[in-house]
């Protein structure tokens, strides 16, 4: 007699069946896919036993070729072979063309200013091209694992903003891949480097890949990874080393490439030289029928400025965490560019310790993402892992006078929700505009606008009576939702912030720098603006009161109040916050008796016609 398989309603008959989940390192230069098999994380190889899949997409009329085969077609057909698409994702067309003027691609802009690449297959967005890479990785994983994927953890640079993160999720959706979570690349590397070992202390993750640089400072404590601070540069990586070498080759040979195909061939030669110099002190180069020679010391000199740039970002990030290099227990090296001996040497000197390089720097991010994916699908229910990422830039709201009130400060652990109450500025105000901002400065004009929406249906009340609760919520992927609720009626409005394009490289670098450079000036400006807003509010309140109850004052009292009003109105035009503050105080003193009489009048009106027994 056959045994029956019995399960609770809605429960799988095999509840402990291993679910297939992967970690994907969607890189600028190369991409990898990894999975946990037999209890350990491993990178999945393709049919030719290769680990790295070049992030290159070649487009024909009817198909997309991804990886090595696409790379072989790059020099023959550069306009239809898209390389380093990660640099383009989440950016505006203008930003792309200004930042990368030498790209061999032609662009059209959408109505929202997003770039579309002109290809043989038609106009395609960076999201659609990224989706082709994800399709390739998904197919590879399902072939190697022997089944359909439940989902994937996809890694992104810690410095990716909301638009870039959302674009990555959109690419996965187009590829038919469920995103379990977006995970910061440095955090993924830290997981791979011993979360289960119980090690405690502060570590730095130095991630120098093909197109982006990230540094994260993490505290490890009893199975908890807390990101103390993040920094980096979205336009710094091994690709930039290649371009510097290419310029050196052109200068030495005096032969410049004449077309896109020759440019691509030159970059390929430069990349081969860079790789060879990681293990050799001297390399011979054959280019344009000339034989050149470059020493490793010359290469080190060429890239020294870029390496220094990365270390300056490290110093800024340490400062954000209130730490010094000597506080760092270990440094984890991530990204293929960290194989360069000069990079390892300079990082070691800066942090005063020998960097960790025991895990292949190309694999480490994918391996960590796979571990996280395995946990998220429930294959490791006893895991005590807890990841605490942070937001890279403060999120705030515009208040009267063009000021920014920060709701969630920079480097706050996510996921997070913060709420703050605001009120109306004018009598009878029935709507409120909510302006969502990103940045570290005190004034709206110096921060980045993320979204605007309007809360309508506020009951008409005197200024300051309504209570509007504004909630900012950032999920585990760093995406922001904002909700505004009027408390007495429950009327609400909300938005999910999906900016049409991301921050430019200059904006990312300058936002933090300018906040430090202008800190003193910004505080003075804020104090002055706050006093002006307070003064304006008081003046409007007094004029409103006079319209209703001017008869409560005699001529001398009325004259004194009006003189104080005129004086304060003049002070508002000046640049002296202390003088305005004193003017508010003088007006307050001039209206104290008036306020007392108005209060008495209100009480008499409220008690009129009531029997004393009814008054409690």
Swiss-Prot record:
| GO process annotations (BP) | iron-sulfur cluster assembly
Q: Which GO terms describe its molecular function?
A: ATP binding; ATP hydrolysis activity; ATP-dependent protein folding chaperone; unfolded protein binding
Q: Which InterPro entries match?
A: ATPase_NBD (IPR043129), Heat_shock_70_CS (IPR018181), HscA_NBD (IPR042039), HSP70_C_sf (IPR029048), HSP70_peptide-bd_sf (IPR029047), Hsp_70_fam (IPR013126), ISC_FeS_clus_asmbl_HscA (IPR010236)
Give a single Pfam family match. HSP70
Keywords for this entry? ATP-binding, Chaperone, Nucleotide-binding
Q: Which family does it belong to?
A: Belongs to the heat shock protein 70 family.
This molecule's function is given as: Chaperone involved in the maturation of iron-sulfur cluster-containing proteins. Has a low intrinsic ATPase activity which is markedly stimulated by HscB.
Among HAMAP family, the record links this protein to: HscA
Name the record gives this protein:
Chaperone protein HscA homolog
> Which organism does this record belong to?
Histophilus somni (strain 2336)
Q: Which gene name belongs to this protein?
A: hscA
């Amino acid at each position: 007699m056959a045994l029956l398989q019995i399960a609770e309603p809605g429960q799988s008959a095999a509840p402990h069946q291993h679910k297939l989940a992967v970690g994907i390192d969607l890189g600028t230069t190369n991409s990898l896919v990894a999975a946990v098999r037999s209890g350990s994380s491993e990178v999945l190889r393709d049919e030719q036993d290769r680990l790295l899949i070049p992030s290159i997409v070649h487009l024909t009329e009817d198909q997309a070729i991804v990886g090595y085969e696409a790379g072989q077609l790059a020099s023959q057909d550069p306009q239809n072979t898209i390389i380093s698409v990660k640099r383009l994702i989440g950016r505006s067309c203008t930003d792309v063309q200004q930042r990368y003027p030498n790209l061999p691609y032609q662009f059209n802009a959408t109505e929202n200013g997003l770039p579309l690449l002109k290809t043989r297959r038609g106009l395609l967005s960076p999201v659609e091209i990224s989706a082709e890479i994800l399709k390739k990785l998904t197919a590879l994983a399902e072939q190697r694992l022997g089944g359909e994927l439940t989902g994937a953890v996809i890694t992104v640079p810690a410095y990716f903003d909301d638009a870039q993160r959302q674009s990555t999720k959109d690419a996965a959706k187009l590829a038919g891949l469920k995103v379990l979570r977006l995970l910061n690349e440095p955090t993924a590397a830290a997981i791979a480097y011993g979360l289960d070992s119980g090690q405690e202390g502060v570590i730095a993750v130095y991630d120098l890949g093909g197109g982006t640089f990230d540094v994260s400072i993490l505290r490890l404590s009893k199975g908890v990874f807390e990101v103390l601070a993040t920094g980096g540069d979205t336009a710094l990586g091994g690709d930039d080393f290649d371009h510097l070498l290419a310029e050196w080759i052109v200068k030495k040979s005096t032969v410049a490439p004449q077309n896109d195909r020759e440019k691509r061939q030159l970059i390929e030669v430069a990349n081969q030289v860079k790789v060879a110099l990681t293990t050799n002190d001297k390399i011979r180069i054959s280019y344009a029928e000339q034989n050149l020679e470059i020493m490793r010391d010359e290469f080190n000199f060429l890239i020294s400025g870029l390496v220094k740039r990365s270390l300056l970002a490290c110093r800024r990030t340490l400062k954000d965490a209130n730490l010094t290099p000597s506080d760092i227990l270990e440094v984890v090296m991530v990204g293929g560019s960290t194989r360069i001996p000069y990079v390892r040497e300079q990082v070691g000197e800066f942090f005063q310790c020998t960097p960790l390089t025991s895990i292949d720097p190309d694999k480490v991010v994918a391996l960590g993402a796979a571990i996280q994916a395995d946990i998220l699908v429930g294959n490791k229910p006893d895991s005590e892992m807890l990841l605490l990422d942070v937001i890279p830039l403060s999120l705030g709201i515009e208040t009267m006078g063009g000021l920014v009130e920060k709701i969630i400060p920079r480097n706050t652990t996510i996921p997070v929700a913060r709420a703050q109450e605001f009120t109306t500025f004018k009598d009878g105000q029935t709507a409120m505009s909510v302006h969502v901002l990103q940045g570290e400065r005190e004034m709206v004009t110096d921060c980045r606008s993320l979204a605007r929406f309007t809360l309508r249906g506020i009951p008409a009340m005197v200024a300051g009576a309504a209570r509007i609760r504004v909630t900012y919520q950032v999920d585990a992927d760093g995406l922001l939702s904002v909700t505004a609720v009027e408390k007495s009626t429950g009327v609400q409005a909300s938005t999910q912030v999906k900016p049409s394009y991301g921050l430019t490289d200059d904006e990312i670098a300058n936002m933090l720098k300018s906040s430090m450079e202008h800190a003193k000036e910004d505080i003075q400006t804020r104090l002055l603006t706050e006093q002006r807003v307070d003064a304006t509010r008081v003046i409007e309140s007094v004029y409103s009161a006079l319209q209703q109850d001017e008869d409560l004052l005699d001529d001398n009292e009325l004259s004194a109040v009006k003189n104080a009003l005129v004086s304060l109105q003049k002070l508002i035009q000046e640049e002296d916050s202390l003088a305005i503050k004193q003017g508010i105080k003088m007006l307050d003193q001039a209206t104290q008796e008036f306020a007392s009489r108005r209060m008495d009048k209100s009480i008499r009106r409220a008690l009129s016609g009531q029997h004393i027994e009814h008054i409690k």
